[in-house]
Amino acid sequence: MIRQCVILVGGLGTRLGAATSTTPKPMLTVGDRPFLAWLTREVVRYGITDILLLTGHLAEVIRAGLEGLREWLPRAVTLTISEEPIRAGTGGALYHAREKLHDGFLLLNGDSLFDCDLSPLMTEEPGVLGRLMLRRLADASRYGVVEMSGDRVTAFQERPEPGSPGLINGGVYRLDRQVVDRTSAMCSLERDILPDLAWDGLLRGTESDGWFIDIGVPSDLYRAQREVPQRLTRPALLLDRDGVCNVDHGWVGTRERFEWVPGAQAAIRMAHARGWHVFIVTNQAGVARGLYHEADVLALHGWMRDEVLRSGGLIDDVRYCPFHPEAVVPAYRRNSSWRKPAPGMILDLLRAWRLDPNQCVLIGDRPTDMAAATAAGVTGLLFPGGNLADFVRPILDANQTEWPV
């Protein structure tokens, strides 16, 4: 599973004039934060733990802004910089960062945002060195266009005439580190590397109709001020785990005892496809009782997230409470504001992800879940059992005033 995201943040931004004379494009304010903070927040949803920024022009501004960027992230990740020694181009930036790259990594343009499902990029593919996310535009004249045969990228063409439709590179990639062997100290990924990969049959593409914006021109930077916060401030589905996501066999702490509730993965896929966050909030008193270890819970939740991601869904984040006031294990014997019916886990997610409580629904199977939802100020819905996808579908179809309490 891919854990590193590399972001190109060294462009000059000449089309934006004075706006980028002292500020790199990715650090321009969009809504209430730097544009780059929106990008990094999105990739963290997919389990990325290492973000590497490839800097050039005004690198000192990026470096000075690192702590501010970390404050916008919903959870801690490694956030580092690779600075090119000269103006090296997009391929050259990868070349100079080669010692810091994972075997497989995501690559993003730092001045565009493609709100698409990244799950096709999150696993490596044998015999393939890269996969691109592609967007079909009615007017592709600002960009080069991509030619395809099935899902194989066959060629890249120059910008078409104004008003011409085409399939464009959305600036979101998964690349194998072997691609860097084809780069040099000064080269362009788009002009020098990707066309050769396509010619050699090593490049694949996935088309998405997700929302796309490139802030490289003043009109789109202006449009981004309203549309980026509007589109990326998402509703959230919060799921209890035992009895909602998995069959409650009692004290499920390992994969061996884990069984998905019918429709659980489908429900998560549906919510993700509709643009919702999906979170897990679960009491795990089995740790306090000594039935399994906290490391077992973490491993199980990591496996759940990877399984869902492979199926095209996404669990954005997980909160669990291992404490119990009558714990057998002394280290876990205490009252906790995170243990439902207390709302601590939900409140922490609201804070970390900057969620609107009015746009959040918690689904649980016990009165303690409903009490926690009420205390946190979110809607709570009691799951009676059966197929979770059938239960979730009308919630996604309705707006918050119609949720079936």
PLM feature spans:
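Conserved N-terminal catalytic core of the sugar/cofactor nucleotidyltransferase
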Residues: 1-7, 15, 29, 33-109, ...
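Asp-based, Mg2+/Mn2+-dependent phosphohydrolase catalytic module
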Residues: 295-298, 302-316, 325-362, 366-405
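Short beta-strand-to-loop element that shapes/binds the nucleotide-sugar donor at the catalytic cleft/hinge
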Residues: 131-145
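A short, N-terminal amphipathic alpha-helix
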Residues: 33-50, 64, 263-275, 303-311
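Substrate-recognition element of Asp-dependent hydrolases with the DxDx(T/V) motif
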Residues: 54, 264, 268-304, 314-327, ...
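Active-site neighborhood of HAD-like aspartate-dependent phosphohydrolases
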Residues: 235-279
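N-terminal nucleotide-binding beta1-loop-alpha1 segment
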Residues: 1-21, 46, 202, 236-242
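Catalytic-core segments of class I nucleotidyltransferases/pyrophosphorylases
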Residues: 105-106, 113, 119-125, 137-140, ...
